[in-house]
From Swiss-Prot:
Keywords per UniProt: Cell inner membrane, Cell membrane, Membrane
Keyword check for Acyltransferase: no
Protein name listed in UniProt: Putative membrane protein insertion efficiency factor
Membrane topology: Peripheral membrane protein
Length: 110
């Protein structure tokens, strides 16, 4: 189910945002926020937070920076392979983290 929504969002980003002239009030944009939520949360949580974000993207809110906040369970497995950092997880409190995309990863791997 996630792959279908990711495909629809990428289609929107590539073909339909031409009509909106970059009108998102937040960084990351609402569509990018949705992709990050789908990558880091369960499907239903991602849809819920994305809908809330879209409802806040209007003239009644100031906008600004609004990174996804997720709960992350620490993995105790040790991996000795080379790692690829796609997202940075910035700790907040009580096991919640801000999700920030690693921009260098995209330059080197896509």
């Amino acid at each position: 189910m996630k792959w279908l929504f990711k495909y629809l969002i990428r289609f929107y980003q590539k073909y339909l945002t031409i009509l909106s002239f970059g009108s998102c009030r937040y960084y990351p944009t609402c569509s990018q926020y949705a992709l990050w939520q789908l990558d880091n949360n369960t499907f239903f949580k991602a849809i819920y937070f994305t809908i809330l974000r879209i409802l806040k993207c209007n003239q009644l809110f100031d906008g600004g920076f609004d990174y996804p906040i997720i709960k992350l369970k620490k993995n105790q497995n040790i991996n000795y392979n080379k790692i690829k950092i796609v997202y940075w997880y910035v700790p907040l409190k009580n096991g919640k983290y801000l999700v920030v995309k690693n921009r260098e990863w995209k330059k080197n791997n896509e």
